[in-house]
């Protein structure tokens, strides 16, 4: 199972995520309590293995701001977590994860518009919040999302495949913890999972929870 640990700010946590076996590390550039600067991320990335998949998270940021952050920090991928249009995916030049906030089945129809993405991160819609809500998504909606994309002729990446543009990976996010991620994977059958607050204590990353989350996610038999 592909696992992304998001909202990293400190070297010890990033190193722990890599050592635990996470497939991708997320750094939030959008205004939030987890926000980091391009310079800070460059310093963090410099201490990680060169093959580490590092993802910058942006919310409705100008394209020039995204490109500047990518250039300064050395990111390997970008996550668009706002209301960015499908054409934004082709303007970045890196694999793109597009976050989609889901209210219900009616929101699934627009997923094929983002067919050029490397990942589609599905999370529950919460008014006024772009991610980090701690709310869980109905697993049925993830399975329906896969069916919607398959009917539209969009090939999907499996849980053991890397981020590949044009072959989006369905990534489950929202309310996941070391205690519930295995059950969530079994029920939703996603191509990956993403966690931030679920591996924290009091808003601070907990290394033991990072290890436990990755182990639980990757221990699920499919």
Curated annotation (Swiss-Prot):
One of its GO terms (biological process) is L-tryptophan biosynthetic process. It is an enzyme of class 5 (isomerase). It catalyses: N-(5-phospho-beta-D-ribosyl)anthranilate = 1-(2-carboxyphenylamino)-1-deoxy-D-ribulose 5-phosphate. Keywords: Amino-acid biosynthesis, Aromatic amino acid biosynthesis, Isomerase, Tryptophan biosynthesis. Its EC number is 5.3.1.24. InterPro entries: Aldolase_TIM (IPR013785), PRAI_dom (IPR001240), RibuloseP-bd_barrel (IPR011060), TrpF_fam (IPR044643). Belongs to the TrpF family. This is N-(5'-phosphoribosyl)anthranilate isomerase.
